[in-house]
Design a protein with these regions (language model features):
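Transmembrane helix-bundle segments that form internal channels/tunnels in multi-pass membrane proteins
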Residues: 1-10, 14, 200, 286-447, ...
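Membrane-interface helix/helix-cap signal primarily in integral membrane proteins
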Residues: 2-177, 495-502, 508, 542-544, ...
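Aromatic-rich juxtamembrane segments at the membrane interface
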Residues: 102-234, 239, 511-513, 536-539, ...
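Hydrophobic alpha-helical transmembrane segments in multi-pass membrane proteins
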Residues: 164-328, 391-441, 541-543, 646, ...
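Active-site neighborhood of phospho(di)ester-bond hydrolases with catalytic His/Asp-centered motifs
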Residues: 180-181, 255, 271, 469-472, ...
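Core dinuclear metal-dependent hydrolase active-site scaffold
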Residues: 267-269, 382, 389-396, 400-403, ...
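Active-site-proximal loop/helix segments of hydrolase catalytic cores
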Residues: 514-515, 519-530, 583-670
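Active-site HxH/HxHxD metal-binding segment of metal-dependent hydrolases
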Residues: 519-557, 654
Length: 713
């Protein structure tokens, strides 16, 4: 494996320079709104690439949908880029994800001339991919909208059509494995094939040969995800061993498949689906004798679900930071429903649609009814917040303790199921330790979250004495033509702030402080209040409020969240940590200059959080506070030249400045004049556009500044 890793790095190619290359496309393009992506292979150096293209018109979109086919060769021009590193702590690592697909670079195109593409002769891969696409389109044409996405996922492994809210509900309840093709699906299909082919009179030898031929074809049809490949490879090894009259155990089969996969691509070890697939399958195989020892089906189901839940828990917490307390019981309900009704009925419906169309309407009605009510029930259960427990990402030490405790639990399970005390301790001890590690934490932190062009600052005091969020960031949404709209639009709250807070084990926010009403500061506030227990909402004491602010305040009132109007002179203390509102005065008009300005003593440093305050506000603070020393300044208004004057800087004398600003933003922030002013005053500059999230972690009165991206002064 180490040998494989050492030779997996590709030679570096000139990046960010316009170049032309001939590329073979490896699949159908994925077109979402006005965005196209497709995997390809550069023919000269055999380099696998992810090709991305922004479509310019609806006519071009239709032309690309009709013209671009797998295994075409195209002459394309664009810029080669490295996949982005995560810009926030515990964020999804897209670069590592692409390496798991053996992709080192992204090729961004400026234009795509379909006349520069030509179709080579069909191969088996191409034929299977065409059949897969035909099947997905057939489902889209025939079935109702609530049935299409799930059927495509269950038959062809195409999950991109599933609504984000439904996908999240399955994930929250720990039943996402039911809509990902895995050993369950491969087992059902292989078992049915084996039975049918034997019944029609074929010999075992012929059936084995057919299954060995069918399995790799099915892997391509099913999307070739890590869980599909694991199940197909493992089944193939077992069938092959039987063919040569050499009995191989399931544990040997899964071990061989693991080694083959890792030797082929070591980076797959980081893939969440790969980890979950192997961890759960391995645990179920090891526990199979105990599970099958139970005579009643319900006991077997309960024990199997229990083993699957326990073995997947460390990985679920590492990647998704939370789990459902009722996941085991939800699995007991939905595993039989999917195994015996929904999955078989999906395949029967699809096959009948191709062979006996007259039977289809009755079967489709039955399937639609099952899927509709199961989705409704899943959505309903997932909204019961008391059952969703946020623990955060476990440290390596905590992960190790999880593994040791759960392995000892499985070993005890092999001997006896009567030692309830041992089971309870082995199960609860790592969970309790994980919970305690977030609550009884002597370290505090101030995190400037990278939310693009906006502000969001997390202050977490030691031992969870206080958790404050100053602003939330917000995605500005512009009216788009319908053809440009994507299925699941990106948003700051759901994609950045909420996952980050959950990854730190945060369940409660003591103060949600909204400095002023601009969307790039408050746009995700409602999502935050829906996702966490917010005790207090602090807003600026202004006479006029924007519609967005009014909407947030109304939501807080309806949900019994305390609302505090911030004004000059308001202060609070938690231990040695002090917070004081310097601005605005009561009855200020609603503008950038009415931003809440907070002077804080946290972690032995004096901080000034300025919102979007401008020159007039800075002058007012200068006049009122003559001895306002600051160690770390949050530069106002993303470094705009309307703020951060020389007079203000000389008055407060910060040593470090932090600018929260979006990469290549349309406003040209930060201003060159502001940067020069900071440099001329010997103030060190940190920027979220260059450094990603910026974190000050402290213990007692000393701390260290960290950046998420490599820091280059």
């Amino acid at each position: 494996m180490f040998f494989s890793i050492s030779f997996s790095d590709k030679p570096l190619i000139n990046l960010n320079k316009e170049m032309a290359m001939t590329v073979e496309l490896l699949d159908f393009p994925e077109i979402d709104g006005d965005f196209l992506r497709v995997e390809g292979k550069e023919l000269e150096k055999k380099e696998k690439l992810l090709i991305q293209y922004r479509i310019h018109s609806i006519e071009e979109k239709k032309k690309l949908e009709q013209s671009i086919l797998p295994f075409m060769t195209c002459r394309l021009s664009g810029k080669l880029k490295s996949p982005p590193l995560p810009r926030n702590e515990n964020a999804f690592n897209y670069q590592r994800y692409l390496k798991g697909k053996d992709i080192e670079y992204i090729f961004e195109l400026g234009t795509w001339d379909v006349n520069q593409c030509k179709k080579l002769r069909n191969n088996w891969n191409s034929i299977l991919l065409h059949f897969r696409r035909y099947g997905i389109h057939k489902i889209e044409e025939t079935f109702e909208k609530n049935v299409q996405p799930l059927m495509s996922a269950l038959i062809f492994g195409e999950k991109s059509q599933i609504d984000e809210s439904i996908n999240e509900a399955y994930q929250k309840l720990g039943i996402a494995h039911l809509i990902a093709i895995s050993g369950l699906h491969v087992g059902i299909i292989t078992g049915l094939l084996y039975y049918v082919l034997l019944r029609i009179g074929l010999t075992k030898e012929v059936v084995s040969n057919f299954i060995l031929l069918f399995l790799p074809m099915y892997a391509i049809l099913a999307g070739a995800s890590p869980s599909v490949n694991r199940a197909v490879l493992m089944t193939g090894i077992i069938v092959l061993s039987q063919k040569f009259h050499r009995q191989i155990s399931s544990i040997d089969a899964i071990s061989i498949s693991f080694l083959i996969t890792i030797l082929y691509n070591p980076y797959l070890i980081y893939h969440a689906g790969f980890q979950l697939s192997y961890a759960v399958s391995f645990s179920l195989i090891l526990s199979s004798s105990v599970i099958l020892r139970q005579k009643k089906f319900f006991k077997q189901l309960f024990l199997g679900s229990f083993v699957a839940q326990i073995s997947s828990l460390p990985f679920i917490l590492y990647h998704f930071f939370e789990f459902s307390l009722i996941s085991l019981f939800v699995n007991l309900l939905f595993i039989p429903l999917f195994s015996f009704i929904i999955i078989p009925l999906s395949f029967i419906c699809y096959i009948s649609l191709l062979i006996v169309p007259l039977l289809s309407p009755i079967l489709i009605f039955l399937l639609s009814t099952c899927i509709h009510y199961s989705n409704e029930l899943i959505m309903c259960i997932s909204k019961w917040d008391p059952f969703i427990f946020v623990l955060g990402r476990p440290s390596i030490t905590i992960l190790f303790i999880y593994v040791v405790c759960f392995l000892s639990l499985f070993l005890q399970l092999e001997k006896t199921m009567k030692n309830l005390t041992y089971f309870t301790f082995s199960l609860m001890f790592p969970i309790f330790l994980h919970f305690a590690s977030t609550v009884v934490n002597p370290y505090g932190e101030v995190v400037f979250i990278d939310v693009g062009q906006g502000d969001s600052i997390l202050i977490r005091l030691p031992f969870f004495q206080g958790t404050y969020l100053i602003d939330t960031g917000g995605s500005l949404s512009f009216l788009k033509e319908e053809w440009k709209t994507r299925k699941n639009e990106w948003n700051v709250g759901g994609d950045i702030v909420i996952p980050l807070l959950k990854s730190k084990g945060i369940r409660t926010i003591d103060k949600l402080i909204l400095t002023h009403g601009d969307h790039d500061h408050i746009g995700a506030a409602k999502q935050i209040m829906q996702s966490f227990n917010v005790k207090e909402l602090m807003v600026s004491e202004t006479l006029d409020k924007k519609d967005g602010e009014k909407d947030i305040i109304r939501y807080a009132e309806i949900n019994s969240i305390d609302i505090v109007k911030a004004y000059r002179g308001l202060s609070w203390e938690v231990g040695k940590h002090q917070f004081r509102i310097l601005h605005p005065k009561k009855g200020a008009s609603s503008s950038n200059n009415s931003s809440i300005v907070i002077h804080a003593l946290v972690g032995g440093k004096k901080w000034l959080f300025t919102g979007d305050i401008e020159k007039d506000g800075e002058e007012e603070i200068n006049e009122l506070y003559h001895h306002l020393n600051v160690d770390i300044l949050k530069v106002a208004h993303h470094g705009s030249n309307t703020s951060t004057t020389e007079t203000f800087l000389k008055k407060i004398r910060p040593k470090i400045s932090i600018i929260s600003v979006g990469t290549n933003n349309r406003y040209g922030h930060p201003s060159e004049s502001v940067l020069e002013e900071l440099k001329s005053n010997d103030i060190e500059i940190f920027r979220t556009d260059l450094h990603g999230a910026i974190k000050y972690q402290f213990f007692l009165n000393t701390g260290t500044l960290y950046t998420c991206l490599p820091y280059d002064s």
